[in-house]
A protein has these predicted regions:
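P-loop NTPase Walker
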Residues: 1-114
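Accessory N-terminal region flanking or inserted into the helicase ATPase core
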Residues: 1-34, 38, 42-43, 60-62, ...
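A substrate-engagement module of RecA-like helicase motors
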Residues: 110-139
Length: 277
């Protein structure tokens, strides 16, 4: 197994100075600014290989992406780098590299058997779910706000639901400000539970909330030593809360994002910066 702990050792693997610096950075929170073609996947792969070569169990590594296609790409890149560094490609099966929604589904299912009975709705299936229950959810009452346009009303209701769940807003406060919208959101929540469906926004919100209060969820998350997140500029409020809690439980956090000035840190933790482009 070749040593790949230092920047010079990583440079010898063919990484640029910027990539090597990011892969070797041992800070507990690192933001890697990356643009197209800057080699972010290569940097992620070598960072994973580095921490494994230094003794981190593969089971303690979680890499979050936002699409299955991106997850597959990173898995292939990591496997190639592991072999190049004299490590086994089979380690891929011991770590988690995948979407944040699948990760949350695994965490919830392990912590509470009831969630294994739920059918997960991606965004498209959630839209179809709302369409199938349009009359009984009181959505018709909102149509006059959107000139009686069915699909625009539906899209706005789904957007309101996602904001409500992503940002952890209070349903009581929404109801006090806008009773019609509040009632629709409350009905959606009750129907989803009754029908044993879990939409993407609710899945992450449930995981983020339980990560703060549920001992079994916290125990599961505390086993993570290194968390890597791709496309960090796109995370929602609930996703950021979950990432922050995992960091508070002891994991280092390495995130890759574009040059977005809104990315500065979370809940008191500020990023060290690496620049790939």
């Amino acid at each position: 197994m070749r040593k790949i702990s230092t920047e010079n050792e990583l440079r010898a693997e063919g990484l640029t100075a910027e990539q090597a610096a990011a892969a070797a950075d041992t800070s507990s929170t690192v933001l890697c600014i990356a643009c197209a073609g800057s080699g972010k996947s290569q940097t992620l792969a070598y960072r994973i290989a580095r921490v494994i070569s230094e003794g981190t169990p593969a089971t303690a590594i979680v890499a979050i992406t936002f699409t299955e296609k991106a997850a597959d790409s990173i898995k292939r890149r990591v496997a190639k780098v592991l072999v190049r560094c004299g490590l086994s490609a089979n380690l891929i099966g011991q770590m988690y590299i995948g979407t944040i929604h699948a990760f949350c589904q695994n965490v919830l299912g392990d912590s509470d058997a009831i969630f294994r009975q739920y059918d997960v709705l991606d965004d498209n299936r959630f839209t179809l779910y709302l369409m199938s229950r349009y009359p009984e959810l009181g959505i018709n009452a909102l149509k006059p706000r959107f000139k009686d346009r069915y699909f625009e009303t539906l899209a706005q209701v789904q957007h309101a639901w996602n904001v409500y769940r992503d940002e952890g807003l209070s349903l009581k406060e929404i109801e006090s400000r806008d009773p019609q919208v509040g009632n629709v959101l409350k009905d959606i929540g009750q129907r989803l539970i009754r029908d044993q469906f879990l939409d993407f926004s609710s899945m992450v919100r449930e995981t983020a909330d339980r990560a703060r209060t549920d001992a079994s969820v916290r125990a599961r998350l505390s086993r993570i030593q290194h968390l890597l997140v791709d496309e960090y500029q796109d995370v929602s409020g609930s996703q950021e809360e979950l990432i922050a809690t995992i960091h508070e439980l002891g994991a280092s956090v390495f995130v890759v994002g574009d040059d977005d000035q809104s990315i500065y840190g979370f809940r008191g933790a500020r990023f060290e910066y690496s620049q790939l482009c």
